[in-house]
Amino acid sequence: MEPKRLFDCIEHQLKLFPQEVMLAAKENGAWRKYSTAEVAQTVNSLSAGLLTLGLSGNDFTPEGSDKIAIISSNRPEWLMADMATQQIGVIWVPVYPTTNPLELAFILKDASVQYMFASNKELYDKVMSVKEEVACLKEVFTFDRIPGAKHWSELCLQDADLLEQVNVIKKTIPVDQVATFIYTSGTTGKPKGVMLTHQSVYFNLQMGKKSFPFPDAP
């Protein structure tokens, strides 16, 4: 079946074109590789953990859906956290790593972000420097292991009941639900959030594929 929501793409690849190396990044000077199967498993287990935080899409409106933010450079965990968030109906709010603390606090409050991922100590410290003034922000999880911070792996749960809930919820996510808020850099004023739906982003992917053809094969 053709993907309709962004997170459908992982299952689509797993069924038709599973890769031994879907994602890769250097960790401590050595390449860490992730297969499609491992990515899919991690995404689902992270979704299960996010459910235990009480997060959901609620009524699937931009106002009613819960939000999770991320401040990070490009890395495999970014994609996996993104898909895990979206497939339970929660809106993803990426923040540029170069965003200053004032704009960061504004974005988190404006989007009513409840939880956040930060990639490393520098960005974690930046988030923690504004946390007290962002009343809606409950907790920050990190990709790197940082003393005193909660590591994102704590949220990856292999619980059969929770994983079944994730599968049920995935089927209910409408294609026209907002998948992400993308904030402008704020160079001419306060950052402004742009709402992008699953449908709109996936349509752009399909049009890009037609403009720059590549085969549906490994």
Walk through the language-model features, giving the residues of each.
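Structural core segment of the AMP-binding/adenylate-forming
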Residues: 87-157
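Conserved S/T- and glycine-rich ATP-binding loop of Class I adenylate-forming
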Residues: 68, 85, 116, 178, ...
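Conserved structural elements of the adenylate-forming
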Residues: 40-48, 175, 194-215
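A short N-terminal helical cap/helix-turn-helix that marks the beginning
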Residues: 1-22, 41
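Conserved pre-ATP/AMP-binding loop-to-beta segment of ANL
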Residues: 18-21, 142, 147, 161-183, ...
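Conserved AMP-binding A3 loop
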Residues: 33-36, 179-205
